[in-house]
Each structure stands twice: as C-alpha cells, then as structure tokens.
C-alpha cells in the first residue's frame, strides 16, 4: 500500500511532525472530555496504552508478553457495550485522520522550505544538462510534452467530502501555525479555530447514508479542480517556465500545456448501469458551465487589476471599435449591464489580494443556476401577462433537471423568469443603483483593457446562459458574435491584451494574473476536464448483433474475426448510415446507441477518448469507429449541419493476462488496415492511444505476473506502432494500491520499458489518491512537477532494458511459478472463497456507499466476477494485503534455489523495472501484520479453514525473506526511513482498530440486522483505511 509521502522521499522533520500530532491530539482530547466525559476517556487511554505496550514488546522480540497484553486487550474490547465500542471506533478513526493531516501539512511545509527538492524541475533539468542533453533539446522536449491525468470515480475514497474539506482546513491552520510573526492573540485565535474544526469533525456523521449518484461523483471531481487544480496549474506552469528560463534561457511559451486533465466521472459506464447517455450529457454541460463561471470570476478580477490606459495602437483601435459598436446599437455596454461597467461596482471576492495568495476557494459550493427572490412589481405583472395558464402548465409538465447541489434541476419557469430579468435589467432600476454605477466612458483611452475585458465577460455570461438553456433542454442557438464555443475564441482577446501590455512597457502586468488566466484557458479549455467514455467491448457486439439481425445479415457476434473486419471496414468506407431510423431495439442496446448519439452531439471539444474495456481484437476498435461514424452521420442529416468537433479517438483497454499477450498482435492487425491507418493519420495526427489495465490483470494472475505481462505488452504495442510509423501514447489504468498497480508516480514512470514514454503519457488517478495528491494546491503543484520530470527523464534518458536475454528468461520463470501458485490458491483451492468471506469484511463493504457502481460485474459470488477494488480493499482491512504479494515468494524462491540468486541481485541493482517491482512489494510487506491476520483467523474463521490461513502466513514470510535477500536489505524499508516512521507512528491506534473490527464483525454476523453494529463496523473500516492510508 502506498502512503502519499512516497513521492517525496526527502526526510521530513519528525520532531515538528510529532509536535503537531501532540497539538492535535491534545486538542482532540479536550474536545472529547467535553463530548463524552472523563470516565470514558480513561478507558480510551487504557486501550491505547495496552496496544502501544504490546507493540513495543513485539518490536523488542518479547513475543509471549506481547501476546498476553493483546489477549487482555481483546478481552476488554469484547466486554464493551455497543455504544462504547461505537464511540471508541470514532475516537481512533479521528485520531488516525488527524495524524494524516499532520503528515500532509509537513509535506506541504517541506515543499515550501527546501530550496531545491529532489525530482523538481531545477533538479532534473540540471541533471539532464550535465549528462550531455543540449539546452535546445531540453527546451523542445518540455514544450512538446503531453501528459494527461485522468480523474476517475473508482470507489476508493472512503471519507465524505464534508470531512475532506474539514481536514484541509485543519492542514491550513497548521501551516499558519508555523509562522514566526504570530502575536499571542493570533496564536490564541488559531487554537480556538482548531478547536472549532475538531469539534465540528466530532459532531459530523462520518458515514454516507446513501450511495452517490454519478453526478455526485462528477461534482466531487470538479470540486477538486475548482478548489485546488485551478490554483495549482498556473503555479506549476510558472515553476516549469522559470526553470526553463534558468537553464535554457527561454521561458515556457504562454499557451504551451505540458499537463492536461481528463475525467471518467459521468462517462465510465463499464459495469455501471447508473451512468447513462443522459448522465454523460448533463455532466459534460455541468463541466462547461463551471469552466465558464470560473472564467467570469477571473475576468472580473482582471478588469479590476488592469486599470492602466497605456496600450498599443492596435489594442486602442479594438477598444474604440467596441465602444462604437455599442453606441451604434443605441446603448453602451456600460449602461446596459452592471457587470460590464468599466469598473465593477462590487469588487470580486479576494480581488484586493495578490494572485499568489488566492487559493481559489469556492464561491459556489453548490452548482445551482442562480435565481433571484426579488422581482420588481412591473416585471411581476409583465411576466404574468406574458405567460398564460396553459403556458405555465406546459412548463411545469415539461420541466427537467438542471444542476443543484443535490443533483436535481431548477424549474424551467424559474429559468425563463431569470432570462426575462437579464433581458430587461434596466426596467425598475432604482435611483440608488444608478448613482452607485460609474459614469459610462466616452473614449477607449480611459480604460481600454476594461472595455475589451468587459466585452469578454459579456460573451462569457451569454455563453453561461446558453449552457443553462441546454441543461434545461430548451432550444437555443449558438451565435459566435455573442458567445464562446472554443478556447481559441476566448484566448484571442486575452492574447491581444497580453501583447498590448508587453509592447507598451507593462510586461510585469502582463505576466501576472493575465498570464495565469491564459495558461488556465490553454490547460482547461472550455470544459475544465474532457470526459472519456468507457464501455465494455461485449456491449458493442450486442448492439451490432441487433443491427445485423434486423438487416437480415446474420448475427455479428457469431462471425469469425476476419468476417467481422471485412464487414466493419466495408461499412466504414461507405457514406450512408448503417442503423435505420425505424429500428426497434432492447433497452441495453438503445442505451449504447444513445451514448454514441450524445458523443456526436458533444464532439471532441467536450469529450476525450472512447475507451473499450475488455478489448481483445482489432474488431473491437472498428466496431466503435463504425457506431461512432453512424451516429455522426445520422445527427448531421437531422440537423443539416456537421457535428461539433471531430470524432473521438478510440482506445482499446487490454486488462486480463491473455488480452495483454494479444495486445501487440491486435494493434499490428489494426494498423495493417488501410482505412484505419489513414483515419488516424487524418483525424488524430497519426497518433494511436492504447490503455493497459493493472487491476484485473493483478486479480487474474497475481501482482508479479501482471507486472511482467504489462511490461511485455507495452514493448509489443510500441514495436507494432513503430512498424507502421504511428506515434503511440500509453494510457496506464493504475489504482491507488500496489495490488492494483499503484505506487509512487516517479518510480512507476521510471520503470516503464524503454521507448514507451516518448514525451506523452496518460494515467488514471483514482478515489482517495485524487484527494491525497491534488486536494491541496501546494501538494498538487508538487505532483504535477513530479509527473513532468519523470516523463521528461524517461523520454530523454530512458531506463535500461534487461542487460541480457537470460534476465528475461528468469523473469518468465519467476512469473510462471508465481502465477501458478497464485491461481492454485485463489481459483483452484475449493476452500479459498469461503476463507476469504470469513476472514475479511468483504461482504460488509457494500454498506459503505462509497461509489455509484456495483461491486460485481455480474451476480455471482465467485472471485472472478468480483471487482478488483473490493478484492484489494478487503485484504487491506485485515492487514494481509494478499493481492500484492501472493505468489511472489514462491517465484523468487524457485528461481533462487536453482542457483540464480546472484543473477537476481544483479537484476535488482541494474534493471529499474525489476528493482521497482520488488521495492513496491517491500512497501506492501511493511504494512502487512502477521499476528493481526492470525487474530482475524482465530476469531472469525471456522477451524477447518484455519490451516489455509497458516499456509498463507508462511508464504508471506517466504516473500519477505527473499525480497530482503535479493535487495540486500537487513529489514523492510531500510532505505525509506520516513515511510517506516510514519507507519510505526500509526500502529497503536491501528492495532486497536483491527481488534475492535474483529469483535464487531463477530457480533454483526450473529445479528445482521443491527444497524448500530453496522455503523460501528463501517467506522472501523474508515479508521483502518486512514491508518493504512489506502482502501482498494
């Protein structure tokens, strides 16, 4: 399992970390004294001391006494009344979360206070130049870099969003506490604020009481963008630019975007029936609406800042032209709308603060379409006259959903009244309002930037209104003269402002808030994050089955691969739609076709890739290309104009071991088809994207075999693309945990096969890792920088391949033994499934309400149909973390005993891929706890199956032994003392939580309908996840 500290391996000051833990712990103790009373707090402290003492004795090797103390601890917990057990679970969960906050603060503090961090731009640029890379090559490679982080809604974020925000506020207060200039009064106020936040934490329900909808999940992802990435991106790009200027003499071009963002939230329908075509459209429109709203705020702040009247002649003519246009219409922009006056009558929030300290805090925590309660009497009468009773009935009956904080929509009638108010804002304006507004300008020279930006804001406001109409499903027409559709349209006036300021001697103004806004528009575009669509390959086959059967052509899925390719290629070359308008299909097929129709409506300006999960053949890709083409032709015919944007790039996702082995041949076959090769040359700049999945391959064959098969699959895909002169971008579907391909970003990228990272990369960030890596601007900047430098290094100085063919052969042998051992245990042992259900809280994880999708692909109790997340999640809870290491020990042992131990040691020292694979397994082993897994077995597992647990623990010890031998380490995490200390600091609370979970599981399995017991169990799951710093 990975802590979020892993990407920042520098030592942090543990004295100050411990001081913060003591401060938060002391304040929490005071809060609890008031909330639950002193007698109960004495019990809490006794349990903590018992757990700490047992841990200390075990670390000292005094096992017998440690066992006695743990038995006493178990006995005391078993005698606890349910209410006390529930309160104890809450207490230790909050304690672990507060320790996590202290850790987050110290990573932030380290980033601020170290002059040159390892893996920073300054560090890596310097290394590359010293290694012989020329400044020009370095500059060009950075400017051409294309990295995209894709945020997903995989259900691994266990904390409610409310609690996440409170945790961030506490981290910021700790940061403020480090200031040396605080007065006594300031510090007292700060402590009071901390007490308030901790009290609020305690009095807030930790559990989600209902499952989130896909729109809820999308809203959470967009909040990360608004609260953190919106601020982090300009800071990150400024850092890259400054480093480039320092080492190459040239800054990063203003519109250059080495980093972009995508999302699966609202687009990932693989196994999730709740993600429909309607949901995808709503989420995409929500994303656009929010982008425009953020830009309006930034333009407001910019208009306040750019009060200068010095500008270029060209810019002055533009401002004059805007004024003339307004006067030609008979009314000035500055009279028509308060929002477009030369100086806003009400300054934007935080406008008085410099951009460097604007943390981008939300001014709309709810995504609601704004309405007003006040309406002048004359407008009330006018609206009553304008709308007859029958009109109101039609509106009421036809009202749809638009966005509110609960995912519902405001009524159409409200929106129509709001539009009326917008259009007739002069009617009923009071004398006070007129007095408050500045007088209109008569000439552009007074404030040319405010005039131009005033028009920009007006167009943005109208664009937002158009989106509100689209959300409501009301008719509207896009007018390029009055609104924006593409980022290039918005960039044009902003770049003119920038050029004018530079040419008139105001470069310092140009390079401030304006440059930040230009970089935001270049990075986030008009949608903040482009939405990927994902669907399983079999669903497309079902759709084509329905079509070919209707057309009396046979059943598509029954054809062999060659016949499928012949049919698909022929239809793709044709110019007519394949799907008849009159066709009647079942609901599942209709949903697939509706999704392609929405994709055609939104186009590539709003959407990213179409990802095909469980892809295995070239026909899987062509099937999507055909359905996409057909939907676009049909929509073009209906509307009489081309669909917006271009076709979506189609990305096959290879997941299982067999599919990974077929990835290279599948891509080679695909690129050998003339139509397809010409299509990607023409529409996608000769670029093929291929996704590889880490979760299902790991569950299928074990982590070690999955890692090796992924490595080979990437080599084969790269080779196939090179044969046809096609550029390749690999899309890595990594989870947060090591069992699902997670791990430190830098380590992961640096261990890819040579040639697989050629300046471009896509990678998912899931669940709790999104919040951990990008939830705070300072940590987000650091993570973006790590992505940039890791990809840069892998591009210019690729990692070494295996030194000799013998190393590849040894990997094959280790992988074969490991896979056979893993599968014989997990899939072939008839007792394993029952052991899994008894020894872990897997069955109870479904009560958590942490995701909108089901935990299984199909209604079966088998492990094959269980998703990878609950599979990993369940083993993480018991501290067995089995998916990440099972089979590894057997493989290493088998090869070592054949006389290859020295070869394995050389591979560890010289082959980055092999080294990183073992290092990740070592991190997992450091979080595993053999005595705790034995405790779960003794208390929860039937006696006839306990022998299986014993065997698994022997395998765990074997794995640890051989990992240490091959790495040359005497103990786990020998080279990562920071992580070891952080793990050890959490163990007293974590051990007590595990014992409490075992007791609650015992009671719950005897009384399944007891909601209080269920709540207590879920809180222990939260607490253990906080202590392990991972879920699934």
Swiss-Prot record:
Catalytic activity: oxaloacetate + phosphate = phosphoenolpyruvate + hydrogencarbonate
Region described as Disordered: 377-407
Function, as annotated: Through the carboxylation of phosphoenolpyruvate (PEP) it forms oxaloacetate, a four-carbon dicarboxylic acid source for the tricarboxylic acid cycle.
Protein name from the UniProt record: Phosphoenolpyruvate carboxylase 4
The organism of origin for this protein: Arabidopsis thaliana
GO CC annotations on file: cytoplasm
Any matching Pfam family: PEPcase
GN (gene name): PPC4
Active site: 154, 699
Oligomeric form and interacting partners: Homotetramer.
């Amino acid at each position: 399992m990975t802590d979020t500290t892993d990407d920042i391996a520098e030592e942090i000051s543990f004295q100050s970390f411990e001081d913060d833990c003591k401060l938060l712990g002391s304040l929490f103790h005071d809060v609890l004294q008031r909330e639950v009373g002193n007698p109960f707090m004495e019990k809490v402290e006794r349990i903590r001391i018992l757990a700490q003492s047992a841990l200390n004795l075990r670390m000292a090797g005094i096992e017998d006494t440690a066992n006695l103390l743990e038995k006493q601890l178990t006995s005391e917990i078993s005698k606890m009344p349910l209410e006390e057990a529930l309160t104890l679970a809450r207490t230790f969960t909050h304690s672990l979360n507060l320790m996590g906050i202290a850790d987050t603060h110290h990573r932030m503090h380290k980033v601020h206070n170290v002059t040159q961090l390892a893996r920073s731009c300054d560090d890596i640029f310097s290394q590359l130049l010293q290694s012989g890379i020329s400044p020009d090559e370095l500059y060009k490679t950075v400017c051409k870099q294309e990295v995209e982080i894709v945020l997903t809604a995989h259900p691994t974020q266990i904390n409610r969003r409310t609690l996440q925000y409170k945790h961030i506020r506490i981290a910021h207060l700790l940061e403020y506490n480090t200031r040396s200039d605080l007065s006594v009064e300031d510090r007292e106020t700060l402590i009071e604020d901390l007490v308030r936040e901790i009290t609020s934490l305690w009095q807030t329900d930790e559990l989600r009481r209902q499952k989130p909808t896909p729109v809820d999940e999308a809203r959470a992802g967009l909040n990360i963008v608004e609260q953190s990435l919106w601020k982090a991106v300009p800071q990150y790009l400024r850092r890259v630019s400054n480093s480039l200027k320092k080492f190459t003499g040239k800054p990063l071009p203003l519109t250059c975007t080495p980093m972009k963002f995508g999302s699966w939230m609202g687009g990932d329908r693989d196994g999730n029936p709740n993600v429909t075509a309607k949901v995808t459209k709503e989420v995409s429109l929500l994303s656009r609406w929010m982008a425009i709203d953020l830009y309006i705020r930034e333009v407001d702040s910019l208009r306040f800042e750019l009060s200068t009247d010095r500008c270029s002649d060209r810019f002055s003519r533009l401002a004059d032209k805007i004024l003339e246009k307004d006067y030609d219409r008979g009314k000035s922009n500055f009279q028509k709308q308060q929002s477009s006056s030369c100086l806003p009558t009400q300054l934007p929030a935080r406008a008085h603060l410099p951009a460097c300290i604007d943390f981008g805090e939300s001014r709309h925590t709810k995504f609601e379409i704004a309405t007003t309660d006040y309406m002048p009497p004359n407008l009330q009468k006018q609206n009553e006259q304008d709308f007859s009773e029958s009109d109101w009935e039609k509106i009421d009956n036809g009202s749809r959903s638009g966005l509110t904080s609960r995912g519902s929509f405001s009524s159409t009638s409200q929106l129509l009244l709001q539009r009326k108010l917008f259009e007739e804002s002069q009617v009923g304006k009071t004398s006070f309002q007129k007095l408050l507004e500045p007088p209109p300008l008569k000439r552009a020279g007074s404030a040319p930037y405010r005039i131009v930006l005033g028009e920009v804001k007006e167009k943005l406001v109208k664009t937002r209104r158009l989106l509100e109409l689209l959300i409501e499903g009301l008719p509207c027409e896009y007018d390029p003269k009055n609104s924006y559709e593409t980022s290039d349209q918005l960039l044009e006036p902003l770049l003119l402002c920038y050029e004018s300021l530079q040419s008139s001697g105001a470069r310092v103004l140009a390079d401030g808030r304006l440059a930040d806004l230009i970089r935001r528009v270049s990075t986030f575009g008009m949608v903040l994050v482009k939405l990927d669509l994902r669907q399983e390959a079999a669903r497309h086959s079902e759709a084509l089955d329905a079509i070919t059967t209707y057309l009396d052509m046979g059943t598509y899925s029954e054809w062999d691969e060659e016949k499928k390719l012949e049919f698909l290629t022929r239809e793709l070359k044709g110019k007519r739609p394949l799907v008849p308008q009159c066709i009647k299909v079942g609901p599942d097929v209709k949903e697939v076709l509706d999704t392609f129709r929405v994709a055609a409506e939104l186009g590539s300006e709003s959407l990213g890739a179409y990802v095909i999960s469980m892809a295995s053949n070239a026909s899987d890709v062509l099937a999507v290309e055909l359905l996409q083409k057909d939907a676009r032709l049909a929509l073009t015919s209906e509307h009489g104009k081309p669909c917006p944007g271009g076709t979506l790039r189609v990305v096959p996702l290879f997941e299982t071991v067999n599919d990974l082995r077929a990835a290279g041949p599948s891509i080679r076959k695909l690129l050998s088809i003339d139509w397809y090769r010409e299509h990607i040359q023409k529409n996608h700049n000769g670029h093929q994207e291929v996704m590889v999945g880490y979760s299902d391959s790991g569950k299928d064959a074990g982590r070690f075999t999955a890692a090796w098969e992924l490595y080979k699959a990437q080599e084969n895909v790269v080779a196939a693309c090179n044969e046809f002169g096609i550029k390749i971008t690999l899309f890595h579907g990594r989870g947060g945990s090591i069992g699902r391909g997670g791990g430190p970003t830098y380590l992961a990228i640096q261990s890819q096969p040579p040639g697989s990272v050629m300046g471009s990369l896509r990678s998912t960030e899931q669940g709790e890792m999104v919040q951990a890596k990008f939830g705070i601007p300072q940590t987000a900047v650091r993570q973006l920088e790590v992505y940039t430098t890791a990809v840069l290094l892998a591009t210019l100085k690729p990692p070494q391949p295996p030194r000799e063919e013998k190393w590849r052969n040894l990997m094959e042998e280790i992988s074969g033994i490991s896979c056979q051992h893993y599968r014989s245990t997990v899939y072939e042992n008839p007792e394993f499934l029952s052991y899994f259900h008894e020894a872990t809280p897997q069955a109870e994880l479904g009560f958590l309400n942490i995701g909108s999708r089901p935990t299984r692909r199909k209604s079966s109790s088998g492990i094959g149909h269980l998703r990878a997340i609950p599979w990993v999640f369940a083993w993480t809870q018991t501290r067995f973390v089995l998916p990440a290491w099972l089979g590894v020990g057997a493989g290493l042992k088998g090869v070592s005993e054949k006389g290859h131990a020295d070869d394995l040691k050389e591979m560890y020292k010289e082959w980055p891929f092999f080294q990183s694979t073992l290092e990740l397994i070592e991190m997992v082993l450091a979080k595993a706890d053999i005595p705790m897994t034995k405790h779960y077995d003794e208390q929860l597992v039937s006696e006839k199956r306990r022998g299986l647990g014993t065997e698994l623990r022997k395998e765990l010890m074997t794995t640890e032994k051989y990992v240490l031998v091959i790495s040359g380490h005497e103990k786990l995490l020998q080279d990562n003392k920071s992580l070891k200390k952080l793990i050890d600091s959490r163990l007293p609370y974590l051990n007590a939580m595990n014992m409490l979970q075992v007791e609650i599981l015992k009671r719950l399995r005897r009384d399944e309908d007891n909601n209080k017991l269920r709540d207590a169990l879920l809180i222990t799951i939260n607490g253990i996840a906080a202590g392990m710093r991972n879920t699934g």
